[in-house]
């Protein structure tokens, strides 16, 4: 028997589009006196409703007319699922019975695609205009500057709502592509979605207390393995869950069990955080609090980011205040993908609420072969054969910054306003590509697969808490001048290029309570992909809107760009970050973090100005020497134009100046002004200066003016 009511025919909705206007829906949830669809009421968001309310919506849906599913088709596709969930999901039963603590906020594809990344502002600024006559190019039924766009995500070719699909599963690919399959199988990509019973790190006990916590486990309070479809994540950073209705777990249950529908459903307290549970112990929190008095010390200090358990954060939620009601089709599946072998949507709906049935019909889970190569890949009958998707689908999440669009650079090229998707004050997970987009490396053609093997993305044990990707090309393969200097230094001889140029900066958890970007911590578990270090005493990588508080709760933080439009790293993140998951920190005595460093106290850096002073001790002598050598070479070059020397002496002068010029070229190509190897760089420049002085002495002692 069907447990859901079918949606009113879509054609009827098109005719009645104006009737579902966001301002006419009755609800108790209001904002500025207006109803807010989906906030405490069983309605989809106004972003989706606006799509449906457009009188010309049928002109924008390509699937029926062209056989191709485009952005708005994906958004409309979710309607029937939401009808089912509004009628059947436990959230609404708890709410109806007064056993819900916190307000649910519906989040659908309309919100995620059209609102995420401030895509609305992008749509407004993106004017499709014919340059010859000034008229708008009409390839959609929207007015110029109003056409919906998605900036935060790239759509996958197929969704969990597409039935039937042609997915065959990674094991089928592995029958012929053994090397690629084995590499993938041991990577974290293969572990992003796991069923209960697939967790060796806790002996398959999802309620086992983790690390030194009293009772904090992978699954939150009131959530049992038999009530979920899968967990999301690995021991590297965090664990979340997807419930039996394929809805993101943004809640926990107090004094009861979700599977029984007992107790009280509470917003947040839903995501296990390894960094908090294992490293950020009460003792470490107290240590940080001494230096940063506003750092959370007690459970209540974590505010809406925290919960009732040490190590269990609130993600996609504000503890006891509000939480997203968000199906996996709206969010999770974009990057933490899975697919079913159901042949019809009726089979799919009949299985919702029954996790065992959903698991039985799962044909693919994790970032599998077919997510990039297409369903069925190159096989006869498949729809792949090329690369329907790539890394950037999940790793190039942008955020549109309107202020940047209004700059001269943004007026010339609108993509200048494409900034990095943020989680509060830190770059979000999945922004490696959007960080790289604003870099000289990207402009030169570097892409993810330049350095990474997409099949083997994890180096070492996937159960480790350290972020260490597998690399197929090292920085020094291209940066030979830097390699030459770095191999001759003792200062950072055990460090890699990434130690300074790719600090852990990104947030997976949006753990706002522990984000202190000016102190380069502490919710930073993903490596940055900016590379360029800005040696400046004041300029910061991460900034709120001008004139606003630098508190992490301030809205609108962005990644700074330099005069060339490139992102850059400030000295605090480069030298003194604090990160328990950054192997370049943990394997090198904590670098210069005042909270992790094992170096002498004088090398524990507390602020950017202090670091700048230390760097200047390296760079100033190098720059001074460089200037002397360059000036000497220029003087000799001019003298040789007017001075005649014996052949043997001229040869000697030219050989000496060539050797000095080689040093100049090396230092210029290196570009660090001694930071990569201060003693060695200064030693080479000392030698170059000697060459110049010797050449000058030869001219002074043997030459005469050719014009005399």
Curated annotation (Swiss-Prot):
Its main location: periplasm. Heme c 6 binds at residues 441, 475, 478-479. GO terms for cellular component: periplasmic space. Heme c 3 binds at residues 369, 372-373, 455. Heme c 7 binds at residues 497, 500-501, 676. Residues 1-22 form the signal peptide. This is Dissimilatory sulfite reductase SirA. Transmembrane segments: none annotated. Heme c 8 binds at residues 492, 575, 591-592. GO terms for molecular function: cuprous ion binding; heme binding; iron ion binding; oxidoreductase activity; oxidoreductase activity, acting on a sulfur group of donors; sulfite reductase activity. Its EC number is 1.8.99.-. It catalyses: [protein]-disulfide + hydrogen sulfide + 2 A + 3 H2O = [protein]-dithiol + sulfite + 2 AH2 + H(+). Keywords: Copper, Electron transport, Heme, Iron, Metal-binding, Oxidoreductase, Periplasm, Signal, Sulfate respiration, Transport. The lineage of its organism: Bacteria, Pseudomonadati, Pseudomonadota, Gammaproteobacteria, Alteromonadales. Heme c 4 binds at residues 189, 391, 394-395. Pathway: Sulfur metabolism; sulfite reduction. Its cofactor is Cu(+); heme c. Respiratory sulfite reductase that catalyzes the reduction of sulfite to sulfide in a single step, consuming six electrons in the process. Required for sulfite respiration under anaerobic growth conditions. Does not contribute to nitrite reduction.
